[in-house]
Amino acid sequence: MNRLAFYIGIENLEEIKNMDNLYLKARLLVDLLFAEKKDKAGKPYLYHLYRVSDQMTTLEGKVAGLLHDVVEDIKTPDFPELDVTFDDLRDIKIPEEIIEALQLVTKTPPPTRFLSKQEKLNYYYQEIDTIIESNNLLAIELKTADMSDNYNPERLSELPEEKKEWFTQKYSEPLKKLKLVKERMITC
């Protein structure tokens, strides 16, 4: 059974499965999944998904922007067997091109939870390098849009100073690198 049914109900799942318009399918799915979720500043999480989607220029990009946090963030800690998977997205007919990009940008937890801040940063930087090395333009554009929104000065201003410093340290250099790679890929 598709795990999405646990979160959005069987009727909604069937409606989404049968939708032909890919963008509306993704939009309805995230509207249902993230309706109550808040970001680190206490704002509706959906706003982040919409902003990332709005930065993308193709239909596939806009859909990926909406869906980019579904597998990473829709979890039930006490019941990991209910975590949403990429197969759940395939089941609702999300194209493989989009799923491949989502797989590349979806963070995997570090091997241990007891890493130092520098080890966490190094692990994150390795994930960015993996995205770049994939040469998957959709994934590179998606990660660039996601990081640009997370590193937006307006959003950062709503966070405590410690979080601002962490995000600056985490996003500043990798974002520059991604933008450069994206620009090279587009102009070649």
PLM ranges: what are they?
Residues 2-188:
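Active-site helical microenvironments for divalent-metal-assisted chemistry
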